[in-house]
Amino acid sequence: MIFLIFSFIVLLIFGLANVYIYKRLIKKITLFKYFYKIFSFIFIVLFLAQAVFLIFRRDEYLSDTWYEILAMFYAPTYCLFFMTLAWDFVKLILALMGKRDKTYNLILRLIFELSLIVLSVFLIYASINNALKTPEVKSVDVEIPNLKKDLKIVMLTDIHLGKNLHENFLDKLITKVNLQSPDMVVIVGDLIDTNPKDLKNYISKLNDFNSTYGTFYALGNHEYYHGINEVLDLLRKHTNMKILVNQNLDLGFIDIAGLGDLAGLDRGLYAPDLARIKVDLNTSKASILLTHQPKTALLYDLSDFDLVLSGHTHGGQIFPFMFLVKLQQGFVHGLYDLGEKTKLYVSSGAGFWGPSLRVFAPSEIVILNLKGKK
């Protein structure tokens, strides 16, 4: 039911946006004067593609190729909507400036129209490319008083391996991570976003991450959506990652723990169990907690940990959704102080969810340079 309501709202928003763009932008552009019927057809196809993607995106019968193509059809509407707002704003300014020479107005209008078309094409390309490209590397220094030696950690979240991001994306991600020569790699949830059996042929490539202490993994909410036990079986069988589900590992100089995701509370499987983790936690040593959703820090007392690592938010992924994410999660992206001792880093993620769109929320591979207090 929630999925149906969500789908209806999204389609209503994009349907109205398409109508607004066509009536307020396309039909007003002089350069498109003889192509209105063609654009009418284009916008009908655009909306139908958006509807098909939204309705069937969870369907196994939608091939990877069609999924990738349909996921791009949201970018034109999104970008053109803001271009239309800009168009209406400029027209308002010109109206307030009063009457001018007709020739001057026509030249000015044509220049603006041409600029708008070029900018729209660029924005559509950039928003799709920002989602699909290999993430950039971001370096963050974090001071941890109890840490006995410096540590370089690569943090990955929200890779979302599935119908849109698959083997080729993972290969590039691994190559870029290995160039950083990390001491350890942590994957903080939403690694898998499809039926686990679809990843069987290449999921073992996760073993190609090279680091001193290995790769550590905690659950995300999307793993629950695709059969949490099947996901865990796949990862345990085909990878050598250290899977932390309400578990703490003592590495000698540091403790690293992984908490079950909040999605487990609704499903009654692998729900967060902080008490279980704290049984083995040595609070006199440096410690890291992997927990996918940052709002965990608002629901649980995490003050025993030095560093909490989260993802889930995608940095908002699409402007202006970062403001809604802030309301829902309490945190969006970056380094936060949770108290005297505890710090939280929320990553914008390596992949994306839903439409192939990232606007003002770039993906990232995070290098955490942990330094003991000198």
Swiss-Prot record:
Protein name in the entry: Uncharacterized metallophosphoesterase Cj0846
Species for this entry: Campylobacter jejuni subsp. jejuni serotype O:2 (strain ATCC 700819 / NCTC 11168)
Recorded GO MF terms: metal ion binding; UDP-2,3-diacylglucosamine hydrolase activity
Keyword S-adenosyl-L-methionine attributed: no
Enzyme class, broadest EC rank: hydrolase
Residues where a divalent metal cation 2 binds: D190, N221, H312
Coiled-coil region(s): none
EC number(s) per entry: 3.1.-.-
